Amino acid sequence: FKKDSLKKMLPEIRKLNLLKPGEYSLELKSLLAECGVAIAYVPYFKNTYVNGATRWLSSSKVLIQLTPRNKSEDILWFTLFHELCHVLKHGRKEGYISFWEDNYLNKDFMELEDEADLFASETLIPPKEWEKFYKNSSLKYSEIINFAKKIGVKPGIVAGRLSRETGKWAQFSRLRKKVEVSV
């Protein structure tokens, strides 16, 4: 596992979100493999509520597993960067498959999850850009699309963040595109 290489690779990985799933899958696997990280799409098991998991296969190899739960591009990319945070910042302490229901009262667990969520959010949408957009936008589709283009992400990623922060999932659902991944 090459931590410094992975840190440097994050902007390249982020750019892949603009491609179609069939176009970015092989490139994503290749970029991550250069850093000692494998990625696999695994089936979603009903009622587990798991979008992703991270585990260390050896001292030099990490496996990130993503499920097709919710099947939307914003959740897929958010989950990828969430798991990459566990790899970069939390190390080999434990595998990071988290059943929220089992751990929501565990302060240490929640701190790691909150940190990974923040990392994913801020990697996809830079905080200063987000703050300016959110403060000054009337949240029209055209504004969302233009903002997404400006920061180099798909509109669905911005719509997903807006949905999560406002609780208005239906309002932005048209921009949140579904993805199909082969498991």
Regions found by a protein language model. Name each.
Residues 1-183:
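Active-site hotspot residues in diverse enzymes, especially metal/ion-binding acidic/histidine motifs
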